[in-house]
Amino acid sequence: MNKFGLLLLCALFSSCFQVTEKITHRTNQSGDYSLVIDFSDSWIKTRAAVMLGEVDGEKIPSEAEMKQKLAQFRSDASKVKGASKISTSYNFSNYIFKLNFSYNSLEALNAVLNTIDKETKLVHFKEVNGVFERVASYPIPEKLKEKKDKKEDLEEAKITAVYTFDKQISAAQNTNSKFSKSKKTVFLKHNVWNVLNDNSLMNNSISFTP
């Protein structure tokens, strides 16, 4: 099981959680990335699951194990050429986990994201002929789809992508996209249940004003 899959497994026992991915991407291909996994709306249930250590036969990582996984991410990401300002944080009062880093190319961005799940090497972001593309692959355990009794909870849980650029956006391929007034930020949100069943719902191709 990958590192942040371990954290998201807590969703099996939580009524609500939020995953927010933010990118500030510049024309020179550098940028800043952040990922927030937020269980604060159901912190009591999440804390109970962590304290039990096992629910419905599934092992729940301890707080110490979560800290270790975040530390391992920092170590792995620091070895990626072109990655910098790598940081993680955790809040065990509300169960909020964050990771942040900067990158000097999309290759570096992809390489850092691939340290989260070492079993696969994916191209998460690319730019072709001036079009910025996101090929979504969020680290949510596939086995959640088998938990039909959790469907309602997972429909309440949300994944949000917020991408900001230093030039104006002219169009976005995903019809669920919303734009800021400045036309430099695109927003996309879906519930976790739908994304589990179709990861492509979070895919997007973003074009810019010449």
Region annotations inferred by a language model:
Residues 14-15:
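C-terminal motif of bacterial Sec signal peptides marking the signal peptidase cleavage site
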Residues 36-44, 176-180:
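Short, solvent-exposed aromatic-acidic interface loops
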Residues 19-37:
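One face of beta-strands
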